[in-house]
């Protein structure tokens, strides 16, 4: 689930009190003044289970608003927001501009969005349709994706990646080139400045669930560049490491936004990363499948078992866990474990572990999972056992998010103060 944040507050400058909170909604720069920290929000893939991180994000934004006023939005505080699949959709909702150049959606709008549109994106099947759909998995996706496509087209229009209000990182996988394709605002190449609509459809195109997505852009020479995309979860269901890598690449290219200061030209070190990574839940302790069961599965068995898809479930959960393990290892080894908070529910049961069951009962249950997760103890990964253990004295995830919000607010006010003083 993650680590508490107790030490990073020392990065905030004593002059932050001089900043006027009333001006926060007018400040939307991603520039990091000297001495600052890099703030990253990462949201896993997981279909309809996006309601879980949606609940967490809503709570975080509520705490930011308590500190800085009702106009505060998540995108105002994070230098990078990364999301895969359903997380990519939420990333776009939080970072895409409306007509007033403010975030399209507030954190509190995420769960209602999923409750309204989830049943139409993943329509429930009757008994006879269920049998037919299981057989159809051998010849086509479970859902046609038409509602999702039209919804995102209406929502995002022609807005492009380069227009987001903060840096975003959205992984996809190109099945023609057979390699990950990462769309990020840091990438200056014209061919990557695609429409957010296309990127969201691509990162959400989960194999067997939704059709792959094809679209074209042009490079600097006007040459056509084509994309043949499926769900980013194939490559990076937990995009936290991709987000870190993206920032690191910009450091290597001496991007001034990610340098420690303008004099030394030194990159910002790992100790100045402040990361919130939110999962969509897993059935790790639910005994979802067994080797005895899997021993008898053929192609169809691996594609459909009860409410789940074992093949998708296995690689997406494994991908998320390995990323968490690597980051936790690095941050703990560098003695900056407090700068990384992972919030993840590991004990989903029954239909709650499905990525596409969108009945009213399950949607409400997933929201409750998110609310309960807020009340659970902050935990960190034991690198020797691989298990998550509560951190003594760290309180609940709710407490950790309050501390996190305070750090974000302090850093933002510090930036406003530095900016008002001419960047010195």
Where are these regions (language model features)?
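Conserved catalytic cores and adjacent C-terminal regulatory segments
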Residues: 2-424
